[in-house]
């Protein structure tokens, strides 16, 4: 950077002494040397040859290392020729009249009014350039004025975009004046104000264009009066060998001054000062400093670098250029350490494809982005100080030192905007942050050197030669929207689209609204307008919105209420179960007497299992995870089959219920109650539920597989039980019902079909389809809405008298007696249920309590000892009437030999509810004389059972009655989808809402092995090798409780 003080010589004295010596030296000038510069054939000879020769001699003298106090006369001779324009400063020019037009132009250019007036007086108002020279020479008195002149010299008005600019004077091509010869400028005095003295007259014209305003699209320009001749107005076509092609310059209104921060607020900013540092750069180290349109210098190259080997430093221009278009080239200037020939050598060989767009600086001129959006800077001549050789290279032509090389603009329709009329611009404080261009990929345009072109150094940026200004802190990205000027940073298609929208007069908000509904062409623009910090995903099209709305509308407020009530209840229940498991662990550890370290280890194991359980609960299950082996039984609206889980090869009993049948028969509440009791039951009397899940058509219960069969199958085989066997089973049944009552449930469907016998001969309860816990979710009315038929499963229906579904006669019978018993079972247990074991208060709906289950115990005891139910009838309707009139229909046959205790227990259980045993719980039955031989204080399940079923292998199903695979349930299953669709009626609009919170997974899942298989009596004869493997795997499996 040039030093702030003047003169830039080795003289060490104050300013007043220097002025005095200058004046004395001017009175006694020394003889000038006759050595001159090399003059070309077309050089300008208007300057005195003696002056040129003297200056050349002074340069040669300065190249030598002079001592601090060198020859004084040579220094004065140097100063004399640099101050020739001010030779009359001590004459009558002080009283000369100041040209008001020139004064105004200097003030507009940023000069101080007092200094401008003094300069015009001292120069006699000859020209503006003379006044600027005076101001620059007096800049040591006021550094601000020196800075103003330096900025004016380094910058120039922007290039115009008019296709045919008006030429106010003959161009260089048509005059006798030719471009002066190339000569080197060296020495310290050329860094100071005397640099303009070396400028030929033709190049000074480009520093001071007219101040008139004109529209860019007009063919003619209006030119107000100027303080200098119109013959020196800038508009010329540069021909010659120095240029790769012709460059056309046109006049632009005002001075394109890039003012420094010291006087920026004193003068009105112009349209050119709104340029900012380019956001991206070409790959070849081509980046951009803050001053647009300029090339700044690099200071790290040696002065002896040959021509063409110096880097060029690019500063972006205002508008973009496109490949193949005759648009504005980037204005180039050589570095201070390079030759001017570098520019012309590159200019003739390097194709400039494009110039990257420079971003607008937010500190400058925020309100004028639309007045002249395509005006670029016109670069002024750049001074150099590194030309130490007095002679140019012989291989180079004689170029001039002008670096304001521009190209003719062809107006591109993309860059055209509607400009109504030029208006004077004033400095206004910013009221809104400037629109920041969206981040784009760096420009891919680079300088591609043709063959024979020199330039080994990459193009990079040097910020040392220009006044840098730090940008302000950025605004939040979500507050910055793209402006009209941002259209230059996108591709050509997006440019055309955005300009067409702006010409139609649409606002940014309108375009933002239309972009969400428009075509794919403005997808890029729509993405840039989205708020970047929003965490909510933005839906791209209206079709997704419609799908989302349809999904939301499909769930009614009733469904939301239904779901939330059950969900909150289950969340609370889950927490209570977690606390209960922790308390249970603490109690067990206290009983075992574990030390503190062992207890802590057990707690960690429980915590890990809790974490695994939470993760497994979220895993979705479906029926494809199981393989069906064999059907075990068929119920009213479902079936039970033996299934194997694929991953663990464990055997389960999987109960499947069709949703359509559950809804048609109003069994939603009963299914919910069955799921709840099976999930909550954690004792040895109830079949354990491991998983429950659902799909579109069915509900699935995955439970313990009890291989011993049910009590009904055993009754059919044995017909009549011995009294000791009946006593054992009724005692276990009493304990099982007691456990259900303690859980808060009523089974309501205790019958031999729902009593299973495990492999040890002990019983378990199953099929809680009619169970109720007196909960709001177990109430059938909670699931009913509209005009849906309200019918309980135990209410007589039309199918009760229809025994056409009984197919016992279709089977081949080996024994007539067995066939008759099977038909009797069909009569007792039809597909729609039987009232044989139901208490009369339940059938009469007079209100019932847990006593109804004890009625069923008396009926089962009667059937075990007698061989048939007490209210057997040909049809379910007749059976129901007999149950209701139990006082007249209940008779114990006289031919059956029963003990008095058994008769008494039957009559005390099958009686009115107010005098029935069990009012005080199961203790009433335990105290009955019939159980005198049973010790209820001991765990009865640990006692050996009178009857142990025969199980040959884990998948043995011989204890279950064979089931016809072509049963009505299977025939109807093919029409389940069709029947399911017909449920979408006004009375049952959303049937799937009834099965919320159905999914379940047990915490203690026994590692996938639900039961223990006993060793077969003869393994070699009863099991094949595959079955033996399964048997061995399940042999040692016991429930694992932490």
Curated annotation (Swiss-Prot):
Any Gene Ontology biological process: inner cell mass cell fate commitment
Active site per the UniProt annotation: 749
S-S bridge residues: none
Post-translational modification: Autophosphorylated and phosphorylated during M-phase and the G1/S-phase of the cell cycle. Phosphorylated and activated by STK3/MST2. Phosphorylated by MAP4Ks; in parallel to STK3/MST2 and resulting to its activation. Phosphorylation by NUAK2 may regulate its activity in phosphorylation and inactivation YAP1.
Transport among keywords: no
InterPro entries: AGC-kinase_C, Kinase-like_dom_sf, Pkinase_C, Prot_kinase_dom, Protein_kinase_ATP_BS, Ser/Thr_kinase_AS, Ser_Thr_kinase_AGC, UBA
Cofactor(s) listed: Mg(2+)
Protein name in UniProt: Serine/threonine-protein kinase LATS2
Species of the source: Mus musculus (Mouse)
